[in-house]
Amino acid sequence: MPKANRRAFLRGAGVSLVVPPFLSLTRSANAASSLSSAAHPATTATGAPLRMAFMSIPNGVQQDHWFPTNSEDGIALSPTLEPLAKVKGKIQVIGGLDHVHATAGNDGAGDHARANATFLTGARARKTAGKDIHVGISVDQVAAQRVGAATRFQSLELSSDAVRNSGSCDSGYACAYQYNLSWSSPTTPVTPEPNPRLVFERLFGAGEHGQRQKNFDLRQQSNRSVLDFVLEDAKELARALSSEDRIKLEEYVSSVRQIEERIKSAERFGLVPDPNLPTPDGVPIDFGNHIDLNLDLMLLAFQTDSTRIASLLIAYDGSNRTFPDLGIIEGHHYLTHNQRVPELAKKVALIDRFYMQRFANFLEKMDKVRDVDGNTMLHNSMIVYGGAIADGNRHTHANLPVVLAGAGGGTLKTGRFVDAKQKPMSNLFVEMLNRFGVEATSFGDSNGGLSEIG
């Protein structure tokens, strides 16, 4: 095995498995350089990697079930937020943030596409169904372009929904607006990857694209795991680790194997697909499993320091997906426009909670992973969950549903509800960029920062 460095690899035929940087091997080899890097971007004051991620939910939320209150012991969680109970001391729920460029203005209908495009850009999307799309660079890509060279991948873009970059999708708005969160320039969306298998191969397959495909085919033919090809390197590495970190290595290897097995299973089995939502080959049919796999892959990418910036389109805005496992046969978008009927409003709240449960599971896993500085990965992260529509019935874009998880390496005050009092959502992004080590005086339609979060 090569001499230890910050990104040690377990290597085998067609496989390159990154070793998490928190292992004692990399910690001892890089303690001085790591702890002296506190002034570097995307790094905490202790020298650990600082991560940033963004996740979008569609169609707003059921207002009566979303917003919490503050109590003597922190956040008093609302019904939708109850899945966050185990990590409620490590999050902030932010109210009072607005996205004015998601409103109709002079552009008329098309709130869902417009909101999706505005969420991470803070910019107004040009109303067009043609190739002359124009919105703004997204906050994740501002960060990626400044600090992305520090990791194998500048950023990671994932989707649990379809991918569409051509045609008209919402009242004269191009599909690119509705199906992409990340934009590397005002005219260039960064297409997310919806196939967990391809994400897995990108993270752990060796070689260039064509060679990775050949290596994958070889493993499929022999019915072997990626881990089977690196066992000797793993044994050699384990001998160099402390007993505590050998356990961490075993846990990491086990998590990789479990995800690989879940991907294989998802490729073979699943629920009957929604007839209105054709599923591309290789994408899990079970929607909840698809979201969970994407979040677990994001966790592995962070854990191995393959990237420090990620985004996940949980579902495109305007999604009319049904949820038969929840006993919901009506489409989500339809339900949001019929919330005057109490029983239908309850179904919207159930869908909101379904999404929140996936997010909560992810945060709990992050909170169990120890980072190179001894803190948890969640402590050393800033994770935004929300959307650019507040009330899906009236298509409002003020007082948006936003959760900010993680302590940003100790720079954020968690365990509370914060009222931003009608500030642009872009102010939050300015604040996050600066705490990420990317100097920013403005972003999108910001009019300052959001010091309230710290």
For the regions a protein language model found, what residue spans apply to each?
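Ligand-binding pockets and gating/stacking loops
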Residues: 1-454
